[in-house]
Amino acid sequence: MQMKRTAFFISDGTGITAETLGQSLLAQFENISFVKLTRPYIDTEEKARAMVQQINNAAESDGARPIIFDTIVNRDIRAVLAQSNGFMIDIFATFLSPLEQELSADSSYSVGKSHSIGHNSNYMDRIEAVNFALDNDDGARTHYYDKADLILVGVSRCGKTPTCLYMALQYGIRAANYPLTEEDMERLQLPNALKQYKHKLFGLTIDPDRLTAIRNERKPNSRYASFAQCEFEVREVESLFRRENIAYINSTHFSVEEISAKILVEKGVERRFK
């Protein structure tokens, strides 16, 4: 039986930093099932006391201490949380103290510093990249491809849209995507809209059985979702990628984070921010 533990990601800001680092660390423990709870904007002692009650309830229910990842700046609020029956990992204290020593400087200990608009010059790049991904989704527009950093190509429902949006949000990458249709495959060549941008193309493919399952959620029992159709499209699009010398990866067993990282490395595209 798989062990179960509760994990809290607690912050006086958005909770993004605590959640991102906490998720990465917990992923290393594959034999433990974690109930993950994000609690942003715990910015008063009253809210912290309410959190202590939640943590203690989880400890009693699980029969084990919850794991707490926090990025709380205020020492008084942290002191309240420390009274809980949880195992606390103070992310700022863990990393900032050694950095202060190395840099011979005091940190600002500012709430929400890494994700605030006022202190983040990348905010508009992020918004523009997301708008670009949405405007150029699914081959809807092709006349802005000259402004794209990347153009993802592949069969319908292989993961192009979420990958484009993730790269936009996380790295400010302007990524368009174009679905290759049965008609495109029958021509045995790239669509005209893509030919002059071949250097920007990256292919996504997927296992036919997985594609069938995804398409059946959208159009059950249709030819579009049949295994025979999915197998045909995947086979033909992979043949097209090889013929046109377009790099591609199979998205079946990778997360959107892994897919995005592999694409950027393969294409040598620099992230606008990190």
Curated annotation (Swiss-Prot):
A GO molecular-function descriptor: protein serine/threonine kinase activity
Chain sites annotated for binding ADP: 154-161
Catalytic activity: [pyruvate, water dikinase] + ADP = [pyruvate, water dikinase]-phosphate + AMP + H(+); [pyruvate, water dikinase]-phosphate + phosphate + H(+) = [pyruvate, water dikinase] + diphosphate
Keywords from the named record: Kinase, Nucleotide-binding, Serine/threonine-protein kinase, Transferase
Database matches in InterPro entries: Kinase-pyrophosphorylase, PSRP
The protein's Enzyme Commission number: 2.7.11.33, 2.7.4.28
A UniProt-annotated Pfam family: Kinase-PPPase
Role according to the record: Bifunctional serine/threonine kinase and phosphorylase involved in the regulation of the phosphoenolpyruvate synthase (PEPS) by catalyzing its phosphorylation/dephosphorylation.
Designated name of the protein: Putative phosphoenolpyruvate synthase regulatory protein
Organism expressing this protein natively: Pseudomonas aeruginosa (strain ATCC 15692 / DSM 22644 / CIP 104116 / JCM 14847 / LMG 12228 / 1C / PRS 101 / PAO1)
Upper lineage: Bacteria, Pseudomonadati, Pseudomonadota, Gammaproteobacteria, Pseudomonadales
